[in-house]
Amino acid sequence: MKVKPSVKQICEKCKVIRRNGRVMVICENPRHKQRQG
């Protein structure tokens, strides 16, 4: 899980979602998991 000030989709399988008021990227590639914060 990378924590970044701005999250972006890295590949076409990445999805930007909101969870508990946080913007996150989920992907089938675990290296692409990101959270804003």
Swiss-Prot record:
Transmembrane segments: none annotated. The keyword Acetylation does not apply. GO terms for cellular component: cytoplasm; ribonucleoprotein complex; ribosome. SUPFAM superfamilies: Ribosomal protein L36. InterPro entries: Ribosomal_bL36 (IPR000473), Ribosomal_bL36_sp (IPR035977). GO terms for molecular function: structural constituent of ribosome. It comes from the Bacteria. GO terms for biological process: translation. The keyword Ribosomal protein applies. Keywords: Ribonucleoprotein, Ribosomal protein. PROSITE patterns: RIBOSOMAL_L36. Belongs to the bacterial ribosomal protein bL36 family. This is Large ribosomal subunit protein bL36A. It comes from Arthrobacter sp. (strain FB24). The gene is rpmJ1.
